[in-house]
Amino acid sequence: MTVSQKGSGREALEPLLADGVRELGLALSDAQLGKLLDYVALLAKWNAVYNLTAIRDPRQMLIQHILDSLSIVPHLAPLGPSSVLDVGSGGGLPGIVLAIVLPEWTVTVNDIVHKKTAFQAQGKAELGLANLSVVTGRVESLQPGAEVPAKFDVIVSRAFAELADFVTLARHLVAEQGAIWAMKGVRPDGEIERLPAGAHVEQVIRLNVPSLDAERHLIKVVVDAGG
């Protein structure tokens, strides 16, 4: 067993996750922490066959995927129970993480790649996430009352597209008083300048991701009604 593998077993990940959650100021139950670790194990297992992520090491999965996704929770949780659409969710990030830690929220994960939504559906089943829905298809083709039940309070993406494209493709799904939230690395000032008409940035939040030495930002975009 390599040093990397020794540091990537569940017993090694537990304190890393607990410390990260504490640093983010989140209060999670033992059951929620357990589900997050189960999710890492499931992602690592499926990734060997389906190439869901370029990250292979479970420890780095925990840091770069789970803790990265958790870093937005302190900024979303104050909204209260809401409906979320995670666009281009891939392996379920951040949507599955949000469904685990915000059980009173309803979360829909979306991707156009069937093998990815198959994994998301498996995650829903194995992790017992009754508040999670999985939708396969292009976001621009999803219609409230058809492919999805209604518009969403929160539309989020972690690695979907440039900001202007994300807004253009998803704005028809934003509920009244809702917003688009884009997870980015370095502050994307150029992307912000290219936002389409009727969309403006309300907040740019510098995120702290425990154990990750890299810039992360959360961009809140508000779109005009009917845009």
Curated annotation (Swiss-Prot):
Keywords: Cytoplasm, Methyltransferase, rRNA processing, S-adenosyl-L-methionine, Transferase. Specifically methylates the N7 position of guanine in position 527 of 16S rRNA. It comes from the Bacteria. This is Ribosomal RNA small subunit methyltransferase G. Pfam families: GidB (PF02527). Its EC number is 2.1.1.170. SUPFAM superfamilies: S-adenosyl-L-methionine-dependent methyltransferases. The gene is rsmG. Its main location: cytoplasm. The keyword Cell inner membrane does not apply. One of its GO terms (molecular function) is rRNA (guanine-N7-)-methyltransferase activity. S-adenosyl-L-methionine binds at G88, L93, V139, E140, R158. The keyword GTP-binding does not apply. It is found in: Cytoplasm. Belongs to the methyltransferase superfamily. RNA methyltransferase RsmG family. It catalyses: guanosine(527) in 16S rRNA + S-adenosyl-L-methionine = N(7)-methylguanosine(527) in 16S rRNA + S-adenosyl-L-homocysteine. One of its GO terms (cellular component) is cytosol.
